[in-house]
Amino acid sequence: MGGGIAQKTAQEGLDVVLVDIKPEFVERGINIIKSTLQQAVERKIMKPEDVDKVLSRIHGTADMSDVKDCDLIIEAVFEDMKVKKELFQKLDEICEPKTILATNTSSLSVDELARATNRPDRFVGLHFFYHPAKNRL
């Protein structure tokens, strides 16, 4: 899901930092994005030069501190309240006060997640349906 959100955001012209816990997971995510974009070229939905533009907007990393200056962070980890709270607490420490934190949860309490941070007023639920890159924003 996170890769699809990153892809869609980059397709819309924004720079993206795609974070995962291990470099090999980041690489796998980027490769899935490349494959999805290639399929779009084959189906004549996208031009090859547009693929390069989209990929140039995605920075993959396993270093969470690379998101410290982002305006918006969209979390897309699996549906586990404890894991999500721990992630948002780390992000709350790393990120600038201006940063809006968003959860992609479809089943957990957004209010409870927001209360795990020091910025519940800058916390939102932002759910994407599968497959994010194929949905219109």
Feature map (PLM): residue ranges:
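Extended, hydrophobic alpha-helical segments in both membrane/secreted and soluble proteins
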Residues: 2-16, 74-77, 84-91, 95, ...
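Conserved strand-to-helix beginnings and helix N-cap segments that scaffold or border functional pockets
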Residues: 30, 84-85, 135
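Rossmann-fold dinucleotide-binding core
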Residues: 101-137
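NAD(P)+-binding Rossmann beta1-loop-alpha1 motif at the extreme N-terminus of oxidoreductases
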Residues: 1-39, 59, 94
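A structured beta-alpha segment of the ubiquitous adenosine-cofactor-binding alpha/beta core
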Residues: 40-94
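Buried hydrophobic positions in well-ordered alpha/beta secondary-structure cores of metabolic enzymes
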Residues: 1, 33, 58, 73-76, ...
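Short, flexible turn/loop "capping" segments at secondary-structure junctions
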Residues: 10-11, 67, 131-135
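Hydrophobic/aromatic beta-strand patches that form the interior of the parallel beta-sheet core
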Residues: 17, 59, 74, 124-126
